[in-house]
Amino acid sequence: MSDFTETVTSGRPVLTDGGIETRVMFETPIHMDPDVQVAALLDHRDGRMKLESVYSGYVDAAREFSLPVLIGTPTFRASPNFIRRAGMPEEDIGRLNRQAAGFLKDVREKGGHEPVFIGGVIGPSGDAYLPGQALPVAQAAEYHRPQAE
């Protein structure tokens, strides 16, 4: 059994991040691309610094209260439809997702706390508030494959 599985099945509280996009939107003057949102911020110094500050805050809080923490990659919209709508090349799907995972590994190393688990965040292919637009299972698996790999 993995450390993650043991942790979440232990009944012990686990801190998670939350509202990353909302925090960037309301706490900073940083402009986010409306299609890929925080996924593209790692390509820019100011965006990267803000994301590091936000994620580090969750790690710091977990350390302060001796809790495990799960932080999710800023990749909710780093998927085919949103990458296309942003006018980015399809190769950026893999690049942005790998970059985000590496970024959070760095945050974890700098945080001086264990355990810090990293979750790969995969969002919907369309509007998350319109469940009728959800893809059938097989089509969803194919659509999300480039992001998951």
Task: Please state what every model-predicted region is.
Residues 1-149:
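Domain-level signal for soluble alpha/beta catalytic cores
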